[in-house]
Amino acid sequence: MAHGIPSQGKVTITVDEYSSNPTQAFTHYNINQSRFQPPHVHMVDPIPYDTPKPAGHTRFVCISDTHSRTDGIQMPYGDILLHTGDFTELGLPSEVKKFNDWLGNLPYEYKIVIAGNHELTFDKEFMADLVKQDYYRFPSVSKLKPEDFDNVQSLLTNSIYLQDSEVTVKGFRIYGAPWTPWFNGWGFNLPRGQSLLDKWNLIPEGIDILMTHGPPLGFRDWVPKELQRVGCVELLNTVQRRVRPKLHVFGGIHEGYGIMTDGYTTYINASTCTVSFQPTNPPIIFDLPNPQGS
């Protein structure tokens, strides 16, 4: 496939033959297509906070997976905050309110948020199934009354919440989606393959910034303890072959914190918490030139 230039024409993504085994998919495409190799694919150093913002640019501040541990985070200067989910432990209304209060004290012009697999109450189908179950895997969530969580996203009064939806701010089209491959039955989990692809097919072309909770295959998705890649193949194909955003921000995999590029799209795993849930990974800033006419 071509690297470094946008794709042309209508592209239809289908379920990849290696969809169910991302580690095998990575190996196959790396050997047969050099899909994850330099010079087009490489690591990117983060921008130091004291770097002046270039004229005619917007500065994005990227964070993720804060898990109700925001008190000690040093937030840098920027224009727009992007938080790609897991801002709570379980999505309890009290946790959401605390997060919203924290957002309210931040100076950014816009704060854009998506849910992650830990925001259980934001996933209506998950909550409906949980109520039917005769067990208490998440006792504090199971005890909630429907009126406590039916419109829990409305508690996020200090941000723009995206869920399979987009917003345009300062001329940038930004789309957010919370879905991740199934992992131990948390919120917004779907089976790999067609179920996830159906969600990615909702992403419109022409998006400048894509926010998902989890990574695409091959970009900041390595889990050393398991010696496995866990990114979504269909998400990778959607990003590289159809949508081609300038920036793809995600989290989910705490071990994958950092920045990469494929020569066209920049990929940021902004997980604030480490694998031991210590909020020590600093926010990542990224500058993009303002769209013409904005």
UniProtKB/Swiss-Prot annotation:
UniProt binding sites for Mn(2+) 2: D86, N117, H213
Single GO MF annotation: AMP binding
Keyword Metal-binding: yes
Binding locations of GMP: N117, H118, K225, E226, G252, I253, H254, E255
Tissue: Expressed predominantly in fetal brain.
Keyword entries, A-Z: Cobalt, Hydrolase, Manganese, Metal-binding, Nucleotide-binding
Binding-site list for Mn(2+) 1: D65, H67, D86, H254
EC number annotated for this UniProt entry: 3.1.-.-
Activity regulation comment: Inhibited by nmolar levels of AMP and GMP.
Named cofactor requirement(s): Mn(2+); Co(2+)
Function: Displays low metallophosphoesterase activity (in vitro). May play a role in the development of the nervous system.
Family note: Belongs to the UPF0046 family.
Subunit: Homodimer.
This protein's name: Metallophosphoesterase MPPED2
Organism this protein belongs to: Homo sapiens
Chain's gene name: MPPED2
